A protein has these predicted regions:
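Stable alpha-helical structural segments in soluble proteins, enriched in small hydrophobic residues
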Residues: 33, 74-86, 383-393, 397
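Positively charged, helix-rich recognition surfaces that bind polyanionic ligands
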Residues: 3-4, 17, 171-418
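Short amphipathic alpha-helical coiled-coil/interface segments
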Residues: 26, 75-83, 259-266
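Long, hydrophobic, amphipathic alpha-helical segments used as structural scaffolds
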Residues: 34-37, 41, 83, 87-94, ...
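Well-ordered beta-strand positions in beta-sheet-rich domains
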Residues: 4-8, 147-148, 164, 195
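Acidic carboxylate diad motif detector
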Residues: 49-170, 313, 317
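Gly/serine-rich nucleotide phosphate-binding loop at the start of the catalytic core
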Residues: 1-74
Length: 418
């Protein structure tokens, strides 16, 4: 089982120079190969320059030789994936008139493969190989006599088998890394009929129903506050920056480093919060002995809907795919499967209806936002949705289980520190 971990390391000026040069060489290699793909007919090549052709044809090129061999090949492979995506979009019309992969104006990340990484078990240090041409260039140009790159971080101690290391261009003596490592996949736990169902939403990010004790609880209430705060801050800074440019006679205002920094901060804050929420949920499932987690599948929920620009912004910002990925791998570490269930009419059917289907859907029962009323009894609408998702899954899979509705009225709100 492969996992990834994002971190950063402090590096010396010499290392910053070396890594920066490799990222520069990778961007130039990308552009050379991209130009060849765009103009292969004009260049009168014998065949279309795919990855297999380019990794051989450019072996002697200047920029290729500035990188470790597998790193250079991986750069060509990333370009190949980008072109394949372009052709798929063009064929399926996923995007109208898609543009081919662009040329890189800035330095790009480089990827070290397993053969270029030396790591001893339990050590907090990695040793990375450098190409012969790069070492010669650094000695002649900058007087840098490094034979290897050594990166230190305490997270490396718990990684027995590092498969890939993605290194981003250094900034201010720091370098961001994404480490992909392998862990032993745990055995799936035996099914015991104990389920947890999850209804995804905007105001209540995850509303959960535990089939064992009938408990319902809400996770992720802080997500919308984070989104709202950063949207307001971005809007405030943009208005000031664009007004300054307009006052100077600039017709088409450009973004600023400050705005880009806020966007990055927003992404990091949301990602960190999602990790904390999904980690709490995975730990809850482990402690309570839950054998299966059922989650509503809301992919394509936004298609063909006119919901207004405010709600549209919230829907499009909802990182449901990230949630699926984070929750799936965290549960997998405990041997618990994550099952996606189509959730049509789960929020409209009564918890007492014979089945969850269009026949028994009563949208009028949702009198207010967050409130479902049936037979004069008030229930939390999101809790009813989570309850019906589990009912629908049991019906589709041919399983039977008595479920309690006592916890649907007042779900507990779980606060996870931001």
């Amino acid at each position: 089982m492969l996992l990834s971990h994002r971190t950063s390391v402090n590096i010396r000026p010499e290392y910053s120079n070396i890594i920066g040069h490799m990222c520069y060489a990778a961007s130039k290699l990308w552009n050379v190969c991209n130009y060849e793909r765009r103009r292969y007919k004009e260049l009168e090549l014998e065949k279309y320059p795919d990855w297999y052709y380019q990794k051989k044809a450019h072996k002697g090129d200047l920029w290729y030789r500035q990188l470790p061999s597998q790193t250079a090949q991986e750069t060509c492979k990333q370009l190949d994936k980008a072109w394949k995506s372009f052709y798929v979009l063009k064929k399926t019309v996923g995007i109208k008139d898609p543009n081919p992969p662009r040329f890189k104006q800035d330095n790009i990340p480089i990827t070290y493969m397993q053969m270029g990484i030396q790591h001893e078990k339990g050590s907090d240090q990695l040793r990375l190989s450098l190409s012969k041409d790069l070492k010669s260039y650094m000695e002649e140009t900058y007087g840098i006599h490094e034979k290897f790159l050594y990166l230190e971080n305490k997270i490396f101690r718990n990684m027995d088998c590092i498969k890939q290391l993605r290194i981003y261009p250094p900034e201010d003596g720091k370098c961001d890394l994404i480490v992909i490592y392998e862990v032993k996949e745990p055995e799936p736990i035996s099914l015991n009929g104990h389920y947890l169902s999850i209804d995804l939403g905007i105001h209540n990010l995850m509303t959960c129903y535990d089939s064992g004790n009938g408990r319902t609880f809400i996770l992720g209430r802080k997500y919308l506050s984070l989104e709202r705060y950063f949207h307001k801050e971005i809007s405030r800074v943009q208005s000031i920056w664009y007004a300054q440019q307009s006052g100077n006679g600039i017709k088409y205002p450009r973004s600023s480093k400050h705005i880009k920094r806020i966007y990055r901060k927003k992404q990091d804050a949301v990602k960190d919060y999602l990790h904390k929420v999904t980690r709490w949920l995975a730990e809850y499932c482990r402690k309570e002995g839950i054998s299966s987690v059922i989650i509503g599948d809301i992919r394509n929920i936004r298609k063909g809907k006119e919901i207004g620009h405010k709600a549209n912004q919230k829907f499009h910002g909802l990182p449901y795919n990230k949630l699926y990925i984070m929750l799936e791998y965290k549960l997998k570490l405990y041997g618990i499967p994550l099952i996606k269930q189509e959730e049509s009419y789960t929020s409209q059917c009564s918890p007492f209806s014979p089945e969850v289907s269009k026949r028994y859907a009563e949208a009028s029962n949702r009198k207010e936002r967050g409130m479902y009323i049936t037979d004069g009894v008030r229930y939390n609408a999101d809790a009813v949705g989570a309850f019906n998702i589990l009912r629908k899954y049991l019906s589709v899979s041919g399983k039977q289980k008595e479920l309690s509705v006592t916890g649907l009225k007042n779900p507990e709100i779980i606060k996870v520190a931001v």
